[in-house]
Amino acid sequence: MEYAQAALELIANTMTIDTDLARLALQEERLQFDAFDQCTAWALGSRIKALSEEAGVALAIEIRLGKDTVFFYSMPGTGPTNADWARRKRNSVELLHTSSYALNLKLEKEGSTLEAKQGLPLRDYATHGGSVPIRVRGVGVVGVVTVSGIPQRDDHAMAIHALAELCGVPLHEVALD
């Protein structure tokens, strides 16, 4: 009986991962800007800050355009650890051009790690959710938005909520279930 229960849990977990991965791919396809500059970064970062205040959570928020940090805000209640998590998650997204949450789920499904698969040090790279590539239609990845301070799925959702608003995509069409 224990084996059957474990097998059912594994199947359910795999289905959840596959469902999330499909939705994450949709997010990366749909959440694209026509243009993105420092003013857009300010609007995005400010919206994430407002959403986090509405939710009563403290976040570190970082937005990069190319290799330049164009927005950073560490809310009261966060600390250096949150900024370091943001750096590590952002490094993974800058290298692999997919969200840190998608990377996490893909590696979990494979039973692997970024260190084992890519040889990347855990000190500098993390695959916990909360970092999302910023895409411009017809151009590709131009930057990264990263959120750190709450559980990884919630970090990711916070970034996606703000991206959907600024890209004019209804949140219900791209949000994780």
Descriptions of predicted regions:
Residues 39-42, 108-116, 168-172:
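Short, positively charged
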